[in-house]
């Protein structure tokens, strides 16, 4: 099958059915008609020359801000990409949007703004692309919600687009010489150091050393946490050039990617490849397979469902379960494993893992990518994983025979829940509930020593869902504190909120319906027995139907926490977690 035929047959949604002849097919509406003279006058003011008005315009958007290591370098990458675009004979139109640092806001009310920043990013990219008639888009994200945000926008505006991932951070190194601290540390080490400190495993000097050196410079949090999970998913989907997700932020490869992006996007435009040609059901199945095989974040469930929705593709948590049932966990990445993303490029990068999965018949090979190659064609060009490498385990000897992402249903979550269960803490848990109305109350109880080793406890943190919190904040601070305190095998953690990609332990989140909507999680009381059976995808509250009916009758919906501003709007519009928390369902 020829390339043009592949593009045409893969195209499901675009209004154009042939390879683009006119590369400025949108911007010409502004730059060419004499009746748009005022528009052209405005462009002259920005530095346009006469010859620029015929050039295709590429919106180069970054999620830059200086206050976060994930994003602090993105303006530099934007400038570099823009220079490359100009050299390719195109016109770079630079713009920027906001971000939220989960690592900084974690454990505070600021985390309520995190998930809704995904929608702001998607809306802002869609808005400027459509309003300013840009012909193509280079998106430069780096922190957790950045990647799904820009991908959602691509699905909406459906103009030739390439994502340039900001890149992963390098590991940090402690300096105090303590044998209790790993030689390679990262942001999760800093979170866990608090639990280790309050349990007297760490001295104050050791805790301070971890905090000071966990993040050595620019780049996204280093393990297979949410940012690296979603960057990898974007690459498997086909929205990046090869190995964009595995080039570290501080690397010559990342700079070379930016320096060559002009020719890449020009080729994408010439071939007429649009995001919805790439974002097919088969491509999403590939992305899910990769996420499961490499131990990716539970947030991938929310985000990939939302990205699929933007492209008109029906995807649900049940698709994750179907794929997880037959996909072994083979990536030995933090938080539950040993390695960080910066290690992967040393064994061939994301493309080598794709090649391994494809050669073992685990991926669809006919999906399209931004370079015009199919996934299979890219895989054939990629190097094989070197013999003896230990980051990706052989399929014959996996870390876990099936996936770590488990979709659970039962009397506690009739609309579904997402479990992150690697098997290290087991696959079955039965314990008595200890209920907290917000995460801060749990941290205080832990500090007081109320959560005890040897007692099988199911910690329930509720009213943290998309509408109830609002914003469905992540529970990395509680999960890290539990692990740091050494309670990973004694405590299961349940919430209608989310978990960070850096979380590990016996964790169940995304519980639907959430407490604020009258879901069963809102009716749990201290001492209730709860069973989590990951092998059978069940999560049940062992309380009689009669008792639950009585509790439901006396339940009163809490008043909204916000009645003005962005979170108030979000709470009114957001769909449930099983539908991706989209606002336009």
Swiss-Prot record:
Binds 1 [2Fe-2S] cluster per subunit. Induction: Expression is significantly repressed when the pH changes from pH 5.0 to 3.0. Residues 1-20 form a transit peptide. One of its GO terms (molecular function) is metal ion binding. Its EC number is 4.2.1.9. Disruption phenotype: Strongly reduces the iron responsiveness of expression of LEU1 by affecting the synthesis of alpha-isopropylmalate. One of its GO terms (biological process) is L-valine biosynthetic process. GO terms for cellular component: mitochondrion. Its cofactor is [2Fe-2S] cluster; Mg(2+). It catalyses: (2R)-2,3-dihydroxy-3-methylbutanoate = 3-methyl-2-oxobutanoate + H2O; (2R,3R)-2,3-dihydroxy-3-methylpentanoate = (S)-3-methyl-2-oxopentanoate + H2O. Its main location: mitochondrion. Mg(2+) binds at residues 102, 144, 474. Pfam families: ILV_EDD_C, ILVD_EDD_N. It is found in: Mitochondrion. Present with 171000 molecules/cell in log phase SD medium. Belongs to the IlvD/Edd family. This is Dihydroxy-acid dehydratase, mitochondrial. It comes from Saccharomyces cerevisiae (strain ATCC 204508 / S288c). The lineage of its organism: Eukaryota, Fungi, Dikarya, Ascomycota, Saccharomycotina. The gene is ILV3.
